[in-house]
A protein has these predicted regions:
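Pyridoxal 5′-phosphate
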Residues: 1-407
C-alpha cells in the first residue's frame, strides 16, 4: 500500500487492505455504513465459537456467559452516551426501528386528534414516515421546519411552531444527506421551554461527536450500530426512564413479560418490556467491541481527525467551479453533498467505482430535502476515522478528470 494511504487506525480494518480495480480501496460512503475493525469481527466469531446460547433464559452456565456478554454491551452503551441507567438503553435493530418504536408506542399513548408533531425538512425517511403513519392513525398534523439555502435550520420558524397542540419534536442532529449539524442543544431547550418532548436522530452523530444525553437533556436518542463500526442489525433507543415507563410495548412475545395467562399478560420491567423475542445477541456483542474500539482511540482524537478531513475536502471542492456544494454552512460533520455541472451523480459514482473509489449517488433517503434543493440526486462523500487526506484529494482529482471527460 502506498505510504500516503497509511494511517495509524487504518490497519485495524481488514477490508481497507483489499485492492479494488488494482488500487487500494477508497471508501468514502461512511454515512451509509462504516467498515468493521478486526476486533469487532473477532468478538462475533469468539461469541459463536465459545459462548453461544440464548440470553435471559438458561440457568446453565453457557447461557449465563452469553447473557453477561450481551448485557455488558448495554452498560458500555450507557457509559458511552452517559445515560443515567441501563434501564434507559433499549436494543433495537437500528435507528429505523428505534424511531418506529417511539412513534408508535409514544404516539399511541400520547397523541390525539389535532395534535401537532414537529420535524425538519432535512430528515431521513426513517424520521418522517413513522410519524406520518401515527399522524394518519391519530389525526395529527406534521409541521416541517425549513432551512436556508446553506442548510441552516430556521430557528425562528421552529420557535413559532409551538402551541398548546404541539406534542412532539423529532429532529436529526447531523444530516446524512448534506452533513449539516443542527444546533441540537438549543433545539432541545426550545422544545422543553414549551414542555414538549424531543427525539434526536443521532445516526450521523454517534460516530463523529461526543454525546452526553444527560447534558443534552434529550428525551429520546437513537442510532444504528453499523454506523459506529459495529454490526448491522443492531441499534439503540435511549429514552428517559419516566417516559419509557409509561409507554406501551411496541412488540410482544417472549422475554418481555412478567406473567402470561390467557386472560391477561403483565409486562417485564425496562428495558426488557421493549425487547420482545430473541435479540441480535452476537450483533450486540460486536457493538460492545466497537464501542471499546472507539474508546481505545478516544472520540476527541476522532473528532479532530475528521475536522481536518472536512477542511481538506471543502478546500479541494471549492477550488473547482464546476462542483457545487449543497448545504454547507461551516458546521458540516464528515459528509458533503455536491453536484457537478452537466454530469449525473450516478455517472460520477460509476466512473469512480472503476478506480476503486466508493462514493454515494442518490437521494440519500431524503426526498423532501432533494425537492428543496430542486435536484433528484447528489453525489456525497462521507468520512470515518480511517479516512485519509490523500484519499479525499485523490477522489476530488478524479472528479476533475470526469468533468474534463464529459465537457
Ligand atoms: N437517520 C439518519 C440520519 C440516517 O443517516 C439513517 C441511515 N442512513 C437512518 C436514520 C436509518 O438508519 P438505519 O437504516 O440504520 O436504521
Amino acid at each position: 500500500m502506498p505510504a500516503h494511504f497509511q494511517h495509524p487506525w487504518r490497519s485495524d480494518f481488514p477490508i481497507l487492505n483489499i485492492e479494488r480495480e488494482g488500487a487500494p480501496l477508497i471508501y468514502l460512503d461512511n454515512a451509509a455504513t462504516t467498515q468493521k475493525p478486526q476486533v469487532v469481527i473477532d468478538a462475533i466469531s469468539h461469541h459463536y465459537a465459545t459462548n453461544n446460547a440464548n440470553v435471559h433464559r438458561g440457568v446453565y452456565s453457557l447461557s449465563q456467559l452469553s447473557t453477561e456478554a450481551f448485557e455488558q454491551t448495554r452498560e458500555k452503551v450507557r457509559c458511552f452516551i452517559n445515560a443515567r441507567s441501563i434501564t434507559e438503553i433499549v436494543f433495537t435493530k437500528g435507528a429505523t426501528e428505534s424511531i418506529n418504536l417511539v412513534a408508535s408506542s409514544f404516539g399511541e399513548y400520547m397523541f390525539h386528534q389535532g395534535d401537532e408533531i414537529i420535524l425538519t425538512i432535512m430528515e431521513h425517511h426513517a424520521n418522517i414516515i413513522p410519524w406520518q403513519q401515527i399522524a394518519e392513525k391519530k389525526g395529527c398534523i406534521i409541521k416541517v421546519v425549513p432551512i436556508s439555502e446553506n442548510g441552516t435550520l430556521d430557528l425562528d420558524t421552529y420557535k413559532s411552531y409551538f402551541n398548546s397542540k404541539t406534542k412532539f419534536v423529532s429532529m436529526v442532529w447531523v444530516s446524512n444527506a448534506i452533513g449539516v449539524e443542527n444546533p441540537i442543544k438549543e433545539c432541545i431547550e426550545i422544545a422543553h421551554n414549551n414542555n414538549v418532548p424531543i427525539l434526536i436522530d443521532a445516526s450521523q452523530s454517534i460516530q463523529h461527536l461526543h454525546i452526553n444525553v444527560q447534558d443534552l437533556d434529550c428525551d429520546f436518542l437513537v442510532f444504528s450500530g453499523h454506523k459506529i463500526y459495529g454490526p448491522s442489525g443492531t441499534g439503540v433507543l435511549y429514552g428517559k426512564e419516566r417516559l419509557l415507563e409509561v409507554m406501551p410495548p411496541y412488540q410482544t412475545g417472549g422475554d418481555m413479560i412478567k406473567k402470561v395467562t390467557f386472560e391477561k399478560t403483565t409486562f417485564a420491567d425496562l428495558p426488557s418490556k421493549f425487547e420482545a423475542g430473541t435479540p441480535n445477541i452476537e450483533g450486540c456483542i460486536g457493538l460492545g467491541a466497537s464501542i471499546d474500539y472507539i474508546n481505545g482511540i478516544g472520540i476527541k482524537d476522532i473528532v479532530l481527525h475528521e475536522q481536518g478531513l472536512m477542511k481538506t475536502a471543502i478546500e479541494a471542492i471549492q477550488s473547482y467551479d464546476f462542483l457545487q456544494i449543497l448545504g454547507y454552512n461551516g458546521s458540516n460533520v464528515s459528509a458533503l453533498s455536491f453536484t457537478m455541472k452537466g454530469v449525473h451523480p450516478h455517472d460520477i459514482a460509476s466512473i469512480l467505482d472503476k478506480k476503486g473509489i466508493c462514493i454515494r449517488a442518490g437521494h440519500h433517503c431524503a426526498h423532501p430535502l432533494m425537492q428543496f434543493y430542486k435536484v433528484s440526486s447528489t453525489s456525497r462523500i462521507s468520512f470515518a476515522l480511517y479516512t485519509t487526506h490523500d484519499e479525499i484529494i485523490q477522489c476530488i482529482d478524479e472528479l476533475a478528470s470526469i468533468y474534463a471527460l464529459f465537457s
